[in-house]
């Protein structure tokens, strides 16, 4: 038997499809999401409706974004969910969540079992819409969740950690074994909750500058910041901000990255593109 087939659908490798089938895990995720009628619930990658059904049961209306044409068609003819669903057969990476929130008249509650092959770039896409999002609950590769929640001075701490924590409060919810999926992925999974900050703990004047600094620092994470960020900051400027030029990217806190971004935004602002 082909272990990539689930409920008559062949999992497509190019879409990174692994279908959740463990009822205990499904119940735990739905409980963590706690969907309520009247909320603007949006599911990314509903697949074979493992989460869509139990979430949809609690709602009058649910929006789903599904790239796979066959799966989107199955949802349209779903026996009891069909009338409740608004289906966008589209890539979530190009979806305008801000427009949807405006249309629905409230911030979105976004959830999904995300395809692991796009999870990190999709996170960055969603971060650009945090003003339009109330919260997010995602099943991700455990290693990605570890990176999202990591603090300074750890191997998992990187650009994703800094940017996620700049935008959101990040809370791990539960770990999920490969056996909970068809076909089983080769890695462990985990569920994470991301709640955009109501008030930014470390506001920056230009988030593009923060993105640039973190990219340059972590692209050369073994170098000291004296070297990796030498084109942006002199040793005198670093020490003036209370930063040791001998530190590496992974030693610098989110607050310190934001401090650096604000210095640069004031003293060497990026030109509008």
Swiss-Prot record:
InterPro entries for this protein: KsgA/Erm (IPR001737), rRNA_Ade_diMease-like_C (IPR023165), rRNA_Ade_Mease_Trfase_CS (IPR020596), rRNA_Ade_methylase_Trfase_N (IPR020598), rRNA_adenine_dimethylase (IPR011530), SAM-dependent_MTases_sf (IPR029063)
Catalytic reaction list: adenosine(1518)/adenosine(1519) in 16S rRNA + 4 S-adenosyl-L-methionine = N(6)-dimethyladenosine(1518)/N(6)-dimethyladenosine(1519) in 16S rRNA + 4 S-adenosyl-L-homocysteine + 4 H(+)
Pfam families referenced in this protein's UniProt entry, alphabetically: RrnaAD
Annotated keywords: Cytoplasm, Methyltransferase, RNA-binding, rRNA processing, S-adenosyl-L-methionine, Transferase
Main location: cytoplasm
Gene3D superfamilies: Ribosomal RNA adenine dimethylase-like, domain 2, Vaccinia Virus protein VP39
Subcellular location field: Cytoplasm
Function: Specifically dimethylates two adjacent adenosines (A1518 and A1519) in the loop of a conserved hairpin near the 3'-end of 16S rRNA in the 30S particle. May play a critical role in biogenesis of 30S subunits.
Protein name per its UniProtKB record: Ribosomal RNA small subunit methyltransferase A
Species this chain originates from: Shigella boydii serotype 18 (strain CDC 3083-94 / BS512)
